[in-house]
Curated annotation (Swiss-Prot):
This is Anhydro-N-acetylmuramic acid kinase. One of its GO terms (biological process) is peptidoglycan turnover. GO terms for molecular function: ATP binding; kinase activity; phosphotransferase activity, alcohol group as acceptor. The lineage of its organism: Bacteria, Bacillati, Cyanobacteriota, Cyanophyceae, Oscillatoriophycideae. The gene is anmK. It catalyses: 1,6-anhydro-N-acetyl-beta-muramate + ATP + H2O = N-acetyl-D-muramate 6-phosphate + ADP + H(+).
């Protein structure tokens, strides 16, 4: 089956669209990436999404209009992908997260805009959306949802692997070797903290919005991290919170960054030193989470997501783990690091119509496996 996966993460960089050929049943699947592109949001829409993520209030009418505008962009991305790579049979659309609140004595909340019924109508393709709601309703975090896909596509027969996503938020999937008895039951994953979000927000602050991100981490690489300040930031409660755990821009967002800026100003750090310190903090949140919560450190780490293109961040991650644990890209495993999340939601959509649960209770904290996603059929 030819399935489109659509994904826009917390960085709001654009809509990643992957056309994937999927064969097999349940966990015995094979995939082939047929085509991939990133559809850029119209600039005004991106600005609106970021403003809402930062807390801008909307009326009910404005909220509904934004939902429809995002759905139109997702449908456009799916149509453009098919014009280039051929017709699909199914769409799995993650949508655009604008708010995520983990469970805290009550059910968690996670809002993804870009309603699936509108995408189905505009593309004339069956569409699966709202993947997080069933897990949240069962009492889980609703995130991360990719670890089960990672397990069946990227686990190694003999090596312990970590798949580290560096989107706006960072998250890890730990994969034990497949030669271990009941290895699937030992797959774990959680959000590690910030990925690109603080680095991107910092660049936007320093350039008054003229620059969206630090290409290759060049600006940050010109500075020196202030290690005492980094350690102070690492004392944040989320870093040492036991998994299952998830987070978003609501936590690691503008307010968090402004406190980091005030801290840097108090120490009279240069802009480059501040960026270097934020990069070091991001790298060490990953290392600290592994050290605290993995059953053992991995034999190898594979990166995916936008942060994979930040050469300086990759360098600092490698330094954090030393020479004993290689830090590479999922490209080395034959899985495009930019397309990986979109591929995952294509697989989750395929699993949904095959009635195969897509969550891992040990990862999300849900009490049981559940079917992920709501199915919308065009008329």
């Amino acid at each position: 089956m030819r399935v489109i996966g659509l994904m826009s993460g917390t960085s709001v960089d654009g809509i990643d669209a992957a056309l994937v050929e999927i064969q097999g049943e349940a966990d015995a699947i094979e995939i082939e990436l047929l085509g991939f592109t990133t559809y850029s949001y119209p600039s005004k829409l991106r600005e609106k999404i970021l403003a809402v993520c930062a807390g801008e209030k909307l009326s009910a009418l404005e909220f509904a209009a934004l939902d429809d505008e995002i759905a139109h962009s997702f449908a456009t991305a799916a149509r453009q992908l098919q014009e280039r790579y051929g017709k699909a049979e199914l769409i799995g659309s993650h949508g655009q997260t604008i708010f995520h609140r983990p469970p805290n004595g009550n059910l968690g909340l996670s809002w993804q805009l870009g309603r699936g019924e509108a995408i189905a109508q505009q593309t004339k393709l069956k569409t699966v959306s709202n993947f997080r709601r069933a897990d949240l309703a069962a009492g889980g975090q609703g995130a991360p949802l990719v670890p089960k896909v990672d397990a069946y596509l990227l686990a190694d027969p003999t090596k312990h692997r970590c798949i580290q996503n560096l989107g706006g938020i960072g998250n890890v999937t730990y994969l034990p070797p497949k030669n271990q008895t009941d290895w699937e039951n030992y797959v774990i994953g959680w959000d590690t903290g910030p990925g690109n979000v603080l680095l991107d927000l910092a660049i936007q602050k320093l350039t008054n919005g003229a620059q969206a991100y630090d290409q290759d981490g060049i600006w940050a690489s010109q500075g020196t991290p202030h290690l005492d300040l980094v350690e102070r930031w690492l004392a944040d409660p989320f870093i040492e919170q036991l998994p299952p755990k998830s987070t978003g821009r609501e936590y690691f967002g503008v307010d968090f960054l402004e406190q980091c800026w005030r801290d840097a100003q108090d120490l009279q750090l240069s802009e480059a030193d501040w960026l270097a310190s934020l990069t070091e903090f991001t790298a060490l949140t990953v290392q600290r989470n592994y050290e605290l919560f993995l059953p053992q450190l991995p034999d190898e780490i594979f990166l995916c997501g936008g942060g994979c293109r930040n050469s300086y961040l990759r360098k600092r991650l490698q330094a954090a783990f030393g020479n004993q644990i290689p830090v590479r890209s999922t490209d080395d495993l034959g899985l495009n690091h930019d397309a990986k999340e979109a591929i995952a939601f294509a697989v989750l959509a395929y699993w949904r119509i095959k009635e195969f649960p897509g969550n891992l209770p040990k990862v999300t904290g849900a009490p049981c496996p559940v079917l992920l996603g709501e199915i919308h059929c065009p008329y």
